[in-house]
UniProtKB/Swiss-Prot annotation:
Membrane-spanning ranges: none
InterPro entries, sorted: Restrct_endonuc-II-like (IPR011335), tRNA_endonuc-like_dom_sf (IPR011856), UPF0102_YraN-like (IPR003509)
Organism of provenance: Rhizobium meliloti (strain 1021) (Ensifer meliloti)
Pfam family, one: UPF0102
Name of the protein described by the UniProt record: UPF0102 protein R00337
């Protein structure tokens, strides 16, 4: 059996990540959130989903893993710092930033399960 090329593995992982993000966005929308941005990139970092419900802004990191525990532990301290830095930049560009409260969430996407939303995860 021939091994997959690295490019093929990367593409599969990228596709799996995008599907997980869309599943997470659907989960959040059904909870009453409005998706403001997906894959928001800055020079400081990236936020998978920025969702808003009223004056609450949720900066969401999406992880597709085999288990909930694996997904939570996959969000490292470095990733948390990058997400916080990117969210500060996003907030500074909002006209009503003084009214907004920010929360950092994780949505764990596991096989054959509904995505699990973990509010205020870090």
């Amino acid at each position: 059996m021939k091994a997959e090329r690295p490019d093929t593995r990367k593409l599969k992982a990228l596709k799996r990540g995008h599907i997980a993000e869309y599943r997470a966005a659907l989960c959040l929308m059904l909870k009453g959130y409005r998706i403001v941005a997906m894959r928001y990139r800055t020079r400081l970092g990236e936020i998978d989903i920025i969702a808003r419900r009223g004056d609450l802004v949720a900066c969401v990191e999406v992880k597709a893993r085999v288990s909930l525990e694996d997904a939570v532990f996959a969000v490292t301290d470095t990733a948390q710092r990058r997400i916080r830095a990117a969210s500060d930049l996003w907030l500074s560009r909002q006209g009503d930033f003084h009214r907004l409260s920010v929360r950092y969430d994780i949505v764990a996407v596991t096989p054959w399960r509904w995505p699990r939303h973990l509010p205020d995860a870090f």
